[in-house]
């Protein structure tokens, strides 16, 4: 869990964005509003709302990129569509830039990594 950072997902080692979403979906029912969530990366602790925001961002970006892939868009065209724009001011300010994250998700979804 990367608190307010776009995550690095090691697709080459079997990771996937959909697998990351599924993992968060398994955890969310196990915690409540009083649970302190310790992220693996990020400068502060989080909570259920923070983990939910992470999951929702991952799902929305994945859905947006999948639509563009289904339309036959290339990576350059997907990058130009800026599918992460609304999250970039918070999530895109660390080592995983919006461009790198879009490339990672696109590559994961198309198998072109």
Model-predicted regions and their roles:
Residues 1-29:
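Catalytic core of the metallo-beta-lactamase
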Residues 11, 52-53, 93:
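Alpha-helix capping and helix-loop boundary segments enriched in small/acidic/polar residues
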């Amino acid at each position: 869990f990367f608190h307010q950072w776009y995550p690095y997902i090691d697709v080459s080692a079997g990771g996937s964005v959909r697998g990351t979403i599924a993992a968060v979906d398994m955890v969310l029912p196990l915690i409540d509003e009083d649970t302190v969530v310790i992220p693996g990366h990020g400068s502060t602790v989080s909570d259920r709302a923070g983990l939910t925001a992470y999951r929702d961002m991952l799902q929305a970006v994945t859905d947006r990129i999948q639509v563009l892939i289904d339309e036959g868009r290339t990576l350059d065209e997907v990058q130009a569509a800026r599918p992460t724009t609304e999250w970039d001011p918070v999530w895109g300010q660390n080592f995983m830039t919006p461009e790198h994250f879009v490339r990672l998700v696109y590559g994961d979804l198309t198998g072109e990594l």
